[in-house]
A protein has these predicted regions:
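Short beta-strand/turn micro-motifs at beta-sheet edges
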Residues: 18-21, 82-89
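Acetyl-CoA-dependent GNAT
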Residues: 80-82, 146
Length: 148
């Protein structure tokens, strides 16, 4: 089964680009690292709202690691040393969003929606299989279901 996404293009099982000259292979995305303004607010969002496990800290507690369960960490958040400009407007170079797979059914997505709404986070940018919220620093977080 293919899934129609934002465009008319179907989402097929990905295939690696052929490249005989490549001397290594990227197996998967390892983690995302973010600078944040408030580690307590960040913990509440990633741990308490999204349900990621807090797996450790580094640099005297200035970095917190969160895991979805397979790796030591999928997200690391480091306390910023200076205030930042906030989220980038859409369409300019920079991080657009981070997406988390929350299940395989629309019921799974509905549970995610109820959880973020209960935390006072208004979902936006919904598609039939996803929704978005902002973390405490304004990073766009997409929650989606993979309904292939």
């Amino acid at each position: 089964m293919t899934l129609q996404w934002y465009t008319n293009a179907a989402m097929e099982t990905p295939r690696r680009a052929p490249n005989a000259a490549r001397s290594f292979t990227v197996r998967e995305l390892g983690h995302v690292s973010l600078f944040v303004r408030d580690l307590d607010a960040t913990r509440r969002f990633y741990r308490d709202v999204l349900g990621l496990a807090e797996t450790g800290t580094a640099k005297d507690g200035r970095i917190v690691f969160f895991s979805a369960g397979v790796h030591h960490h999928d997200v690391s958040c480091e306390l910023a040393r200076a205030p930042g400009p906030g989220p980038q407007p859409k369409g300019v170079p920079g991080l657009y969003h981070i997406a988390f797979d929350v299940g395989v059914s629309l019921d799974d997505l509905a549970r995610a929606r109820r959880a973020v709404e209960a935390a006072g986070l208004p979902p936006y940018g919904q598609t039939p299989t996803s929704l978005c919220v902002r973390d405490p620093d304004g990073h766009e977080i997409e929650l989606y279901v993979d309904v292939r």
